[in-house]
Amino acid sequence: MAARNAALKVDWAKITTSLGLRGQTAASLQAFKKRNDDARRKLQQLSELPTTVDFAAYRSTLKNQAIVNEIEKRFTSFKPATYDVNRQLKAIEAFEVEAIKNAEATKTKVDLELKDLEKTLTNIETARPFDELTVDEVAAAEPSIDEKTSKLVSKGRWSVPGYKERFGDLSVL
């Protein structure tokens, strides 16, 4: 009875918005809510149906009394099957724990990525224009530039391969 009262008090819209659910998770929750509402509605309809059967009317109509007696005996001895739903509840709880763990891991990754992006944005906003940078500052930002330049100079090459093709020859003859 307590579970039924708790199920009636669930605010589905608040769950979706407060947890910030989107995409597949929100769709799954909405599908679950629909199945829950359909099952509750069907249970309500079935509980309102009368369960009494007038066997005397059947006895007066039918000639074969043995069939009516057999059906009445089975009807009175019928007990609805009860199911142990503990296994399903444990599976749902395990799924919930796993989903929460995955959500927290995703939140941690997103927070780290946001911090990294904020740091990158700050660097971009505070960076000096390229034409104001010195050669030493560019080399400090990308150490491989010094290594490549040293290799080219040690081989006696004073121009960068592909530079003239890309930017043209600016030398005045």
Swiss-Prot record:
Keyword field contains Transport: yes
Gene3D superfamilies with a match to the protein in the record: 6.10.280.70
Taxonomy, superkingdom: Eukaryota
One GO location term (cellular component): mitochondrial inner membrane
Subcellular location: Mitochondrion inner membrane
GO terms, biological process: proton motive force-driven ATP synthesis
Its biological purpose: Mitochondrial membrane ATP synthase (F(1)F(0) ATP synthase or Complex V) produces ATP from ADP in the presence of a proton gradient across the membrane which is generated by electron transport complexes of the respiratory chain. F-type ATPases consist of two structural domains, F(1) - containing the extramembraneous catalytic core, and F(0) - containing the membrane proton channel, linked together by a central stalk and a peripheral stalk. During catalysis, ATP synthesis in the catalytic domain of F(1) is coupled via a rotary mechanism of the central stalk subunits to proton translocation.
Family of this protein: Belongs to the ATPase d subunit family.
Protein's recorded name: ATP synthase subunit d, mitochondrial
Species per Swiss-Prot/TrEMBL record: Neurospora crassa (strain ATCC 24698 / 74-OR23-1A / CBS 708.71 / DSM 1257 / FGSC 987)
